[in-house]
Structures are given as structure tokens and as C-alpha cells.
């Protein structure tokens, strides 16, 4: 934040914090004239409802674009803020000059935070969008026929080459912590944490025209998009 002249305040609360205690903090910052944007960092403790917490934020300061009001504006095609991950995906496609207009786009995952907003923004850009989810019977058939496949399901390396057509563009939004590395010397699994996406990167790499890595792909663009929403004047 400092590199672009933005002061960032990180308010850390205990894991046993109550909803009312968080609400008091958010309401205080809503009325602070020095604060232009507020986000709730996820995941939150299990006893708290993330969406209820988000809806405490003044929608004009909701730079993540996740409050009910901002989600409704997005659904109407008049977004105040494009949710950061969806915005980041579009910035990536724009930077690499990957066209969206008229393209077949499959979005795997329909969450409020990621899949839903991405599908909406892609539609606004003129793409032919199909959203796939756990109840979709022919997801692999749909994704194989798509020019762009965007994956956000929260399942490590779920998408392999059986889901991807030759020359497709793959955007992997997932980020998962997995453990385990086999050691022949010790003949056992060694607990070792690594981050992986929802796409089996090495399995599909040779058939795609472009793919985002995890980590280092969509994640940094999401952070950039938060700041872009912050410094861009909202309607």
C-alpha cells in the first residue's frame, strides 16, 4: 500500500472474538473519514458468519465488492466495485490480450465470492458463459468445448487434461494447502505443506495455450484489484 501512497491498517482480533465485537470495529471504521476501504479477511473463525460480517461494511467502502448491495449492483450490470478476484482475472486477460468477446467460457464453481462474480463480469464483456457446479452432469464435456476455463472449486488439482480442450486458456483461481511428500529413504510420508491450485498444472500444461500458476497467478492480481477498487472513484 505504501508504494502507491495508501496507508493500510491491519486490525487483528482474537479467534474467539464475538460477532458484536467485530461489528463494533467495523461500525467505528465506517464512520472514520480517513478510511476509504474496508475488507474482512477470510477465512473467519467458524462461529462467525463471513457474509453477515461483510454486510456490516458501508457498501461505498466495500472494495471487495461483496456486500449484498454491491452484489445486486453487479447483477444489474452497474457495478460500484467489481469483486477483486473477478477484477483480477479480467486484468490478466486484458494484459495478455486474450479476447473474451464471443468466446465460450466455462466457469467451474458458482460461489458468491468468486465463481458467481466472474461469470457475471464475463457475460458483461460479451462472452458466452456456462457455469458448472457439483450438480452439473457433464462438466468435462462443457469445459473441453470452451475457449477459456476458469476454475474456482476449492479442490486440489481437481481439473486434469480430461477436462481441457487443445489450446484452451485456463485460469486457476483455487489455492489449497496440501501435505505429504514421500521419502524413499525413510519409506514414509513426510508432512510438508505446499500450495496447489484446483487444476493439475503439470497434467494440462502441454495442451493449453496459457495457464495461470498457483501460487503467483491470480492471487497477486486480486491484491492489485483491491487497490485498484480503492483508488478508483466509485459511482
Q: Which positions does each model-derived feature cover?
A:
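Short beta-strand elements in bilobed, periplasmic/extracellular small-molecule ligand-binding domains
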Residues: 1-15, 129-131
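Conserved beta-strand scaffold positions in the cores of enzyme catalytic domains, especially
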Residues: 5-10, 170, 210-211
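Glycine-rich phosphate/diphosphate-binding loop of Rossmann-like nucleotide-binding domains
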Residues: 15, 80-169, 173, 178-184, ...
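Short, small-residue-enriched loops and turns at beta-alpha junctions
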Residues: 15-19, 45-47, 177
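Short, well-structured alpha-helical segments in soluble
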Residues: 21-33
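Short, high-confidence coil segments that cap the C-terminus of an alpha-helix
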Residues: 33-35, 146
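Anion-binding alpha/beta catalytic cores of soluble intermediary-metabolism enzymes, centered on
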Residues: 37-100
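Rossmann-fold NAD(P)-binding glycine/threonine-rich loop
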Residues: 50-71, 174-235
